[in-house]
Amino acid sequence: MKIPFNPIINEYNQLETDINEAVINCLKSGWYVLGKHVETFETKFAKAMNTPYCIGVASGVDAITLILMGLGISKGDDVIVPAFTAFPSITGIQRAGATPVLVDVCSKTGLLDPTKIEKAITKDTKAILAVHLYGQCCDLTHM
C-alpha cells in the first residue's frame, strides 16, 4: 500500500482559481522576493492577528529561529519541544543557539503531554515550543 505523504490536492482544488491567479500575478510583476505582495500579506496578516507588526519569512525554520532570537533565547538555554515533531522545530531551536529538550507526547493525540513537561523544566528552560498536529491543538492552558 502506498500512502501519500501530504495529499493536499483537495484543498488545492477548492482554491485553484485563486492560487493560479495569485501566482501568475506575482510572476508577471517580476517581484519574487519581498515587494508589494509580501507587504500586502504582512499588512493583512498583522491586522488579522491584531498586532502592529508582521514579518514574512521563507520557512518555518526561519520563523522559529527569529521568534526565539527575538525572545533573547540563545546558547545555554533549553527549549522544550515534543519528541514527535517535524525537523524544522529542532532546527529552529538549534539555529537560535539553544538546546532542544525532547519531551514525550500523549499516546492518544501525539501532542506534547503537559504532565511530562514539568519534569523536563530546569533552570535553563526558557521556552516551550508547542506543536499542533493534524488539526489538533495542544493543551496550552495546562502548559
Segments from the language model and where they lie:
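PLP-dependent aminotransferase-like
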Residues: 69-143
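Short alpha-helical
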Residues: 10, 14, 40, 62, ...
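N-terminal "arm"/small-domain region of PLP-dependent enzymes with the aminotransferase-like
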Residues: 1-29
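PLP-dependent aminotransferase class I/II
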Residues: 9, 38-43, 48-54, 115, ...
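Phosphate-binding glycine-rich loop
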Residues: 31-78, 92-96, 102-104
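Solvent-exposed, non-membrane alpha-helical residues enriched in polar/charged side chains
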Residues: 20, 24, 28, 42-46, ...
